[in-house]
């Protein structure tokens, strides 16, 4: 499969989960490292060695302060890269892999092993920069050569186009300012300008992923609907920043349908025209829905299956329309050298200083450039960004 994808021009990034095993908590089955060396492979609380220390939400956490655990993970990665030809890896709950004495550090031996390995250090390595433990959100802190999922981009984009619009319609100010949105559009330097040579491509921008709502569901459901998961709708996050445009779920009202379609393309347009590395959830290109389920990992049925029947329709279906628009956005992005570099086009540096870039211009609807007060004024909802190539 990997060889076939390579022949078709695709790189293959593999999602790997080294933070826990499938044995769950103390009462779980013995089917992995627990049966070999329970005390060495799993993290324990300091006050009671028999108690597992869990930063994954899965009942157990592998102990990456143990040299054998680090060696096991590195050997596994090298096998997939060298023998199978994997081009890179996405590390699930990566903050767990970099905890020493319970605290995250970018200088963790495991991260050092990845950086210094002659094979792995030249591959694409993407971190999910958080876990369920204390101080677990570490977005932007992994450093070179790692890319990281940018949850700030996700939340800012959702709020700006969805919940902030709802608030302004009821006479309130939104949460996101022009400065907030501009920073995300320009590569999130406040998070990723952490090293002299670290660029905007370290920011993996996304609006939706396998966890949470699909992009279409962000515009159809104000609340999660996880009843099919069998946990009385208690599972899954309630922090979705989603709207329903006046009706929960699918609607035949064409005004609502058009509002949702426009909002969806606003989200995808922002994703695909921002500096950084865009990540698109499979199915978002044609408006796939999970019926409001935002924790669908347990569902192997039509809730999560992608329906491609629209491809064979002779009509201009909503799916085909969105697919074509998304394809045009991708083509537009690939046709400009603006997105093939790592510069940050921003006013805000990591240390909070304002710096100008001669490759980005900002305009208000009246054609004037914004002044300093406009950047933090929540009433400023409309602005234009002009990016210039190096030759202009």
Give a label for each model feature.
Residues 1-85, 93-119, 124, 136, ...:
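Substrate-binding/active-site clefts of carbohydrate-active enzymes
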């Amino acid at each position: 499969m990997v060889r076939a994808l390579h022949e078709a021009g695709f790189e293959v990034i593999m999602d790997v989960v080294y933070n826990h095993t499938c044995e769950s908590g103390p009462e779980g089955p013995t089917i992995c490292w627990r049966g070999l060396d329970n005390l060495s492979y799993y993290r324990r609380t300091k006050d009671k060695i028999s108690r597992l220390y869990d930063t994954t939400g899965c009942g157990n956490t592998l102990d990456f302060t143990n040299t054998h655990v680090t060696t096991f993970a590195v050997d596994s990665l090298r096998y997939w890269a060298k023998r199978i030809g994997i081009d890179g890896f996405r590390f699930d709950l990566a903050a767990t892999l970099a905890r020493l004495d319970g605290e995250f550090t970018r200088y963790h031996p495991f991260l050092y092993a990845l950086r210094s390995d002659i094979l792995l250090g030249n591959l694409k390595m993407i971190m999910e920069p958080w876990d369920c433990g204390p101080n677990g959100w570490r977005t932007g802190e992994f450093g070179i050569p790692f890319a990281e999922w940018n949850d700030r981009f996700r939340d800012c984009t959702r709020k700006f186009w969805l919940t902030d619009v709802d608030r302004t319609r009821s006479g309130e100010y939104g949460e996101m300012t022009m400065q907030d949105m501009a920073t995300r559009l320009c590569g999130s330097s406040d998070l990723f300008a952490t090293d002299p040579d670290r660029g905007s491509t370290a920011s993996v921008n996304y609006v939706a992923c396998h966890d949470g709502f699909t992009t279409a569901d962000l515009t159809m459901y104000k609340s999660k609907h996880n009843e099919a998961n069998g946990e009385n709708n208690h599972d899954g996050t309630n922090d979705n920043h989603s709207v329903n445009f006046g009706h929960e779920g699918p609607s035949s009202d064409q005004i609502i349908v058009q509002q949702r379609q426009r909002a969806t393309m606003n989200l995808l347009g922002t994703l695909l025209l921002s500096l950084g590395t865009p990540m698109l959830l499979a199915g978002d290109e044609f408006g796939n829905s999970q019926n409001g389920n935002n924790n669908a990992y347990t569902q192997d049925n039509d809730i999560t299956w992608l329906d491609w029947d629209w491809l064979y329709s002779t009509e201009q279906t909503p799916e085909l329309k969105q697919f074509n628009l998304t394809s045009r956005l991708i083509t537009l992005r690939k046709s400009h050298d603006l997105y093939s570099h790592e510069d940050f086009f921003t006013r805000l540096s990591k240390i909070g200083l304002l710096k100008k870039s001669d490759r980005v211009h900002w305009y208000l609807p009246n054609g004037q450039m914004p002044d300093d007060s406009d950047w933090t004024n929540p009433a400023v909802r409309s602005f234009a960004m002009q990016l210039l190539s190096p030759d202009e």
